[in-house]
Structure formats: structure tokens, C-alpha cells
């Protein structure tokens, strides 16, 4: 079994990190995370920077002190959120060659977000795993946009690595730094990005980009392109994924770390996961349709009156 060693926890792989976007699990607690046997959480650099602010978080002992959570904390770079907002409305700012310019609330005040700033903010958070700044794209973006994304992702990765090395020079316990492989749906660009990031040297590598097509279908082929571009001796991180069936498919092609908002979102909308009968152990015979879990609609008239456990195969409190 592979182990991911961080300053706060040693984590058996594959592993899933629930999203605690603003430093909290929606409709749950970190005690719930521990009870579920999960050893880490993902938190959002950009959202925490806007509210409550990186300086305040640092003054309270970083994210571990601010949240009271003792497991591993992974923070993203904030690049995806800035890309999404600017892509939705260009008046929010622009992605320049050396930095991202962002104007919150379309006001006069502007945020200049550089690769160095990205790393400095994550050090203020005291993150166990930090992500380098990248330029995100959509699979349908034209080739010239994908090429620019790879070029900026590599250049920004170099600057993130240099800033990270400077800030960790005197540390005994060092956090981990992951690079992000971009390239859209072009295999050549994915391989180029992975090769150049490997030359810089990172502790792990994340999938960059959008994993769905225009109709919302899961693009496993793009995830495989990115996985093939990452060194096999390093951890491969499927950022923002996924559903149980996605995780199962992605483990098969080499990914070992996952995070996603979907499990907590499903629960808030009263949909719970339960095992398909016979699939709750490694010896279960896979069904022809590949399904190994099913939805239980907890507030349906049938289920709301049941006194038994949600799933007899699960030892959770429900």
C-alpha cells in the first residue's frame, strides 16, 4: 500500500479529501470526517483569501488553528476560481503572462495574483499540500489557448517552485508542493506539460482543466492523457473528482488522490450512497452494468419511517 506522508498525517492511498471550501464541511463537522476514516480535507485558497483573509487565518495559527482540524489540509492555488470568474465575465480581470489581475465585485480595487503570491498565501494557511498556480482551460478551447495554458503553467510552476524552496529553506517539516498538468484534449500538449513540470520537480501532480464535455459527460480519455503525462513514481491527483464510479475508474488508470463537493452536496439534497447488495466486500462479483452503489432517497415516504440503518453493510452512525 502506498502512503502519502504530510506534516500532519500519513495517508494510505488511494484517498478521498472532502471539500471544506471556507474551512468548514457543509452540513457536517470535522468529527464526521474523522469518523468516516478520512485523513485530509481540501480547502479553497481564493475563497479563504477573500473571507476571512489569509492574514487573519495566519494570526489564528493557520488553517489548523482556525478550523481546529488536525488532519492533512490541501489548499488549491486559487487559479481555477479566478479563471472561472474571468471566463464568465471578462470585466472581472485578465490573465496576463506574469500574473492574474482580478477586480472583486467589478470595483476599482484590484488583486494582482502572482505565482509567488499564490505560494505565500498557502504558507500563511500552513497547508500540508500546496498547489502551484496554473492557467486553467476548457477542453473545447482552441489549440492556441491550450498552448498558452501549457506555457504559462510551466513558467508559473517554475516561479512557484522557486518561492516554495525559498520559504522552506529552514524548515525541518516541509509541506508538499504539487504541479498541475494542463493541455486540454491534446495528447501532445499534455505530454509536453507533464515532461516540463517533471523537470522542475514536484512532490505530486494534479489533473488540470475541465473533466466534462459540453453535454456534461465525463471525459475519462482526457484524465488518462493527463495521467500518462505524469511520472508514475509520484502521486497523481484527480482534482475536483469525483463520484464513486469516477474514482473507481480513475484508480484503475493511476490516480491516487481525489476531492469533490459532490458527496456532501448529494447528502444535503437527501441522496445517500448505499452498496448494491453483495458489493460491500472485495470479493463481490461485479455486475455486468458495472454498478456497485445505488442512491437511497432518505426523505422518501418509504425510507423516512424506517428504523434500521441506512445501509446494514456500513458501520456509520446513521
Q: How does the language model describe each region?
A:
Residues 313-318:
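Local cysteine-cluster metal-coordination motifs and their immediate loop/turn environment
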Residues 1-170, 290, 300-303:
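Non-catalytic, usually N-terminal nucleic-acid engagement modules in DNA/RNA processing proteins
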Residues 151-154, 163, 167, 174-311:
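Glycine-rich phosphate/ribose-binding loops and adjacent secondary-structure elements
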Amino acid at each position: 500500500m502506498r502512503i502519502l506522508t504530510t506534516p500532519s498525517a500519513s495517508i494510505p492511498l488511494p484517498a478521498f479529501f472532502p471539500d471544506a471550501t471556507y474551512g468548514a464541511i457543509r452540513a457536517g463537522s470535522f468529527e464526521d470526517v474523522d469518523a468516516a476514516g478520512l485523513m485530509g480535507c481540501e480547502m479553497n485558497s481564493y475563497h479563504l483569501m477573500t473571507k476571512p483573509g489569509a492574514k487573519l487565518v495566519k494570526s489564528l495559527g493557520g488553517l489548523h488553528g482556525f478550523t481546529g482540524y488536525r488532519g492533512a489540509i490541501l489548499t488549491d492555488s486559487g487559479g481555477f476560481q479566478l479563471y472561472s470568474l474571468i471566463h464568465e465575465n471578462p470585466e472581472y480581470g485578465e490573465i496576463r503572462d506574469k500574473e492574474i489581475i482580478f477586480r472583486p465585485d467589478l470595483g476599482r480595487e484590484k488583486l494582482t495574483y502572482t505565482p509567488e503570491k499564490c505560494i505565500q498565501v498557502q504558507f500563511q494557511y500552513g497547508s500540508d499540500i500546496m498547489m502551484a498556480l496554473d492557467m486553467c482551460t476548457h477542453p473545447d478551447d482552441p489549440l492556441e489557448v491550450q498552448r498558452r495554458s501549457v506555457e504559462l503553467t510551466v513558467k508559473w510552476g517554475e516561479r512557484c517552485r522557486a518561492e516554495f524552496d525559498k520559504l522552506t529553506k529552514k524548515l525541518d517539516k516541509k509541506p508538499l508542493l504539487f504541479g498541475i498538468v494542463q493541455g486540454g484534449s491534446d495528447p501532445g500538449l499534455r505530454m509536453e506539460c507533464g515532461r516540463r513540470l517533471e523537470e522542475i520537480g514536484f512532490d505530486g501532480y494534479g489533473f488540470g482543466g475541465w473533466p466534462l464535455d459540453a453535454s456534461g459527460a465525463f471525459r475519462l480519455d482526457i484524465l488518462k492523457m493527463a495521467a500518462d503525462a505524469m511520472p508514475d513514481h509520484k502521486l497523481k491527483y484527480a482534482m475536483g473528482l469525483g463520484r464513486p464510479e469516477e474514482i473507481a475508474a480513475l484508480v484503475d488508470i493511476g490516480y491516487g488522490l481525489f476531492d469533490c463537493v459532490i458527496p456532501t452536496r448529494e447528502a444535503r439534497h437527501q441522496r445517500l450512497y448505499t452498496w448494491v447488495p453483495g458489493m460491500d466486500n472485495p470479493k463481490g462479483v461485479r455486475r455486468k452494468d458495472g454498478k456497485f452503489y445505488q442512491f437511497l432517497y432518505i426523505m422518501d415516504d418509504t425510507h423516512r419511517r424506517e428504523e434500521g440503518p441506512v445501509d446494514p453493510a456500513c458501520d456509520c452512525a446513521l
